Amino acid sequence: MYRLLALDLDGTMLNPDKIITPMTRSSIQQLISAEVNVTIASGRFPASVWSHAREVSMNFPLVALNGAVTVDPLTGQLLDGVALKIEDMLFMLDVIQQEGAYIHFYGYNVLYVQEINDINRNWAINNRVNRPELDSFEERDELDAIEADLIRFVEVGKDFRTFVNQMPGMLFKAAVICTDHDSRENLFRTLEESGLFQCTRTGSLRFDVNSAGVSKRGALERLCHAHQIEREQVAAAGDYDNDLDMLQWAGLGIAMGNAELHVKEIANVVTASNAEDGVAQAIHTFLL
């Protein structure tokens, strides 16, 4: 019997329009009513993970920023975190700047950017919960504003090195965006081979950088240990590279139908795509 289901958000729990469909919502709530814990394990901001978890009444600790932080499901506050080290970030900045790539850093619900631009301008609002069922634009705008305010933007200026040396709080993740394929792959390889970082591809033009050893799997392992849940009692669903270790570790690794081939190959089972309520289908096929 499974005691925990861990769900990635984008490409998994959310459909292509970034919506929790009624079927997915109902299936998750049925699973929770059957006394199976359900959590989110995502690369997104803690506030975004928390907001989506509240939509389906999750009450198990949540995983955000690729496993760098765990989040209280009731309050949205930090439970535990693994931050990037200052000296490691300075090395990272040297490497990134040599290639002329874009980078920004994640605090706990704070996005630190050199300047607000077209790359990052909508980053906070894109983390909101999409609610197409709301009757009026006014209702949607009001909730969008509330949720966007949960994530702060801080412009630090051109000198990221000075900011990192004097940073006011912990930084848990960096996002690197580079449109040139060769430069991007060189950056990924250099940072990964340094042994200082865990790098994961999260899009066609970008990758995320966490401290070495940080992963969704690692965060779930710690949570399971604290709640006396065995690995064999865990199911996990995902679609992308930052889900690989989680799917391989879980007792039941579920790849989405929209996942790339290498993700499907390491999973135990493949469900329908996120456009076809694949999470709901997996819940009813394997967990209920």
What is the predicted function of each stretch?
Residues 22-139:
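Active-site phosphate-binding/coordination module
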Residues 35-39, 59-60, 172-173, 232-233, ...:
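Short active-site oxyanion
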